[in-house]
Amino acid sequence: MNLFKEKKIKKIIYINWRFVTLCSIVFLFLVILTLRIIFLQIINSKKLAYEGDRRTLRIQSVINRRGIINDRLGYPLAVAVPVNAVFIDPTMITNKNDIKNNIRWKALSEILSIPLNKLIFFINSDKNIKFIYLARQINPEIGDYIKALKLPGVFLIEESKRYYPTGAIAAQLIGINNIDGEGIEGIEKSFNSYLTGTPGKRKIRKDNQGQIIENESLINKSNSNNLILSIDKKLQTIVYQKLNNAVNENQADFGIAILINIETGEILAMANSPSYNPNNMQYMINKNLRNKAITDIFEPGSTVKPIVIMEALKRGIIKKNSIINTKPYFIKKHKITDVAYHEKLNITGILKKSSNVGVSKIALSMNTSELINSYIKFGLGQPTNLGLIGEQKGFLPKKKKLSDLEKATFSFGYGLMITPLQLARLYTIIGSYGIYRPLSIIKIDHPLYEKRIFPKRYVKNVIHMMETVAHPGEGGSQAAIKGYRVAIKTGTAKKVGIHGYYIKKYIAYTAGIAPASNPKFSLTIIIDNPKGEKYYGGAVSAPVFSKIMKLVLKEMKIKPDNLKNKLS
């Protein structure tokens, strides 16, 4: 009996021990599980959240649609057109061996004009690459077709590309963008940040198929802006077409024309020829990209002579009716002469006949600082601060004292280098009777500010003298416009060759204002290296001045101010 009880007690103890052991194991497991949960959810939660986000969360750039560039009347000069980019994520393409025989992959190859073998090469090129562009700037119709193919690992991105409605007419001024939508030339480059705004960043979540399942937030984004230029599309078209015709007719290397509103300083037209089609860069020539109106510098020739006359009148060195001996003369074995011989000329005659002898003798009566400062006063060799990237400053001599020969040649436009825009500004100041107004490429209602830099009466005197340049039989007569008074100055400058010596190539200038009785517009024409029989400014660029200004005055409804000329 006692033996039986003993065995029973041992059995119970054994069973209890097994139960306790099992419970202990279960309890230990629960403790470990609890600790693991605490570790994962509390202690290591940030790391796990990071790992989860790394697999599903993406930061996607949100690019603003680029702002529109309009002319002063709202006509679009550059617009953003919606397009698509196509890219692949090779890590999401599982059946890589079946691509060659897959009809949908063949369809993608054909629509993008990418050989199928090349497509397969992209997919197999690197196992770690998750982003490979297949095509950029495809039209939305092709994008919809590709989307309908439902190929794994093939995705579309919304983009935009630039379209320029005026084409070549304002190409150098407006500029172009690169494939990523960044301005790389012209106004597109100079105002890039204004046109684009600040790109934002968007947090998105993707599923294991790469599809966006959640947009979380949008940060750091500012909108793009539209830009209204001072340019008038109609006037720009007139200026470009007439300039382009002249460049072709004279077999010139290039031409530049700038039209400015004298009352506000607004640039109404700025044209270069030859130009290019910004909507099709396939046949573009690099040298035609530059806006030579601001990037290139030239010796201005006789177009600076009015400055010398005005300064001499102001200083009392000459009077309106002064007579100057204009016989050729020598300065240290260098002969100063004119195209046509004149024994003597009055001051009007010196400008009318463009006498190097006469203007140089006047300049020799001034000291160096007076002469150079008179050029600086009118903005020569000084930046216009127009806001366009690539503008050159030009060059003026820094010597405290010029030799007589240097002073003489300086008076008729040699020994200094200026941009065409600086020359246009000079004649705009003359047209405003000596008031400087900052130039603007942006539409403005009123001048930014005004500053008188020269007494009105001397400027008006010289304007009257400049009117005679376009009179019948004179060197600038081809710049005349029936019914209107124009005040102009022509010029012809020899070009400097690659070795620093003057060569038998020329630049033909005509710059002036109209109508002369109440100037509204200044116009500057430059024709570089005309290769026909004519190369003088009065023969090459003056006719272009007349053709353009005539149409501008008509378009802007400016009343004729020369009724005698109109009736004759």
From Swiss-Prot:
<dbReference type="GO" id="GO:0071555">
    <property type="term" value="P:cell wall organization"/>
</dbReference>
<comment type="function">
    <text>Catalyzes cross-linking of the peptidoglycan cell wall at the division septum.</text>
</comment>
<dbReference type="InterPro" id="IPR037532">
    <property type="entry name" value="FtsI_transpept"/>
</dbReference>
<dbReference type="InterPro" id="IPR012338">
    <property type="entry name" value="Beta-lactam/transpept-like"/>
</dbReference>
<keyword id="KW-0812">Transmembrane</keyword>
<dbReference type="Pfam" id="PF03717">
    <property type="entry name" value="PBP_dimer"/>
</dbReference>
<dbReference type="GO" id="GO:0008360">
    <property type="term" value="P:regulation of cell shape"/>
</dbReference>
<comment type="pathway">
    <text>Cell wall biogenesis; peptidoglycan biosynthesis.</text>
</comment>
<dbReference type="GO" id="GO:0009002">
    <property type="term" value="F:serine-type D-Ala-D-Ala carboxypeptidase activity"/>
</dbReference>
<dbReference type="Pfam" id="PF00905">
    <property type="entry name" value="Transpeptidase"/>
</dbReference>
<keyword id="KW-0121">Carboxypeptidase</keyword>
<dbReference type="GO" id="GO:0009252">
    <property type="term" value="P:peptidoglycan biosynthetic process"/>
</dbReference>
<dbReference type="GO" id="GO:0005886">
    <property type="term" value="C:plasma membrane"/>
</dbReference>
<keyword id="KW-1133">Transmembrane helix</keyword>
<keyword id="KW-0131">Cell cycle</keyword>
<protein>
    <recommendedName>
        <fullName>Peptidoglycan D,D-transpeptidase FtsI</fullName>
        <ecNumber>3.4.16.4</ecNumber>
    </recommendedName>
</protein>
<keyword id="KW-0472">Membrane</keyword>
<keyword id="KW-0573">Peptidoglycan synthesis</keyword>
<dbReference type="InterPro" id="IPR036138">
    <property type="entry name" value="PBP_dimer_sf"/>
</dbReference>
<keyword id="KW-0645">Protease</keyword>
<dbReference type="InterPro" id="IPR005311">
    <property type="entry name" value="PBP_dimer"/>
</dbReference>
<keyword id="KW-0997">Cell inner membrane</keyword>
<keyword id="KW-1003">Cell membrane</keyword>
<dbReference type="GO" id="GO:0000917">
    <property type="term" value="P:division septum assembly"/>
</dbReference>
<dbReference type="InterPro" id="IPR050515">
    <property type="entry name" value="Bact_Transpept/Beta-Lactamase"/>
</dbReference>
<dbReference type="GO" id="GO:0008955">
    <property type="term" value="F:peptidoglycan glycosyltransferase activity"/>
</dbReference>
<dbReference type="GO" id="GO:0006508">
    <property type="term" value="P:proteolysis"/>
</dbReference>
<keyword id="KW-0961">Cell wall biogenesis/degradation</keyword>
<dbReference type="GO" id="GO:0008658">
    <property type="term" value="F:penicillin binding"/>
</dbReference>
<keyword id="KW-0378">Hydrolase</keyword>
<comment type="similarity">
    <text>Belongs to the transpeptidase family. FtsI subfamily.</text>
</comment>
<keyword id="KW-0133">Cell shape</keyword>
<dbReference type="InterPro" id="IPR001460">
    <property type="entry name" value="PCN-bd_Tpept"/>
</dbReference>
<feature type="transmembrane region" description="Helical">
    <location>
        <begin position="19"/>
        <end position="39"/>
    </location>
</feature>
<keyword id="KW-0132">Cell division</keyword>
<keyword id="KW-0717">Septation</keyword>
<feature type="active site" description="Acyl-ester intermediate">
    <location>
        <position position="302"/>
    </location>
</feature>
<dbReference type="GO" id="GO:0043093">
    <property type="term" value="P:FtsZ-dependent cytokinesis"/>
</dbReference>
